[in-house]
Amino acid sequence: MNDRPHVGHAYATLAADVLARYHRLLGFEVYFLTGTDENAEKNVEAAHKNNEVDIQDYVDRMSAVWQETWKELDISNDDFIRTTESRHRVGVEKFWRAVENKGDIYKGTYEGL
């Protein structure tokens, strides 16, 4: 999300939109989620490249561009979530606690397939 969406992003999102619409037509319950990953080093680099001091201001502006792009393309997403939102953090923390509580986080040595 370190820059404006390009045709590749539009292609992938349009393909997902087609699938969501098709499955809705078939009567399936569909929850189509889109969003932006704002917790990346590339966002920091892009903000600095654009002489931005506040990284959050930069990702706020870029996220708005992405949301507007999907609106202009009439993407039928049910929700747009940003990784800097508290509701995302809460979900991620819940996931990692569940994984840890099941004992699925451990130190080891990778042995290959």
Show which residues each predicted segment covers.
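N-terminal, positively charged nucleic-acid-binding surface of large information/translation enzymes
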Residues: 1-113
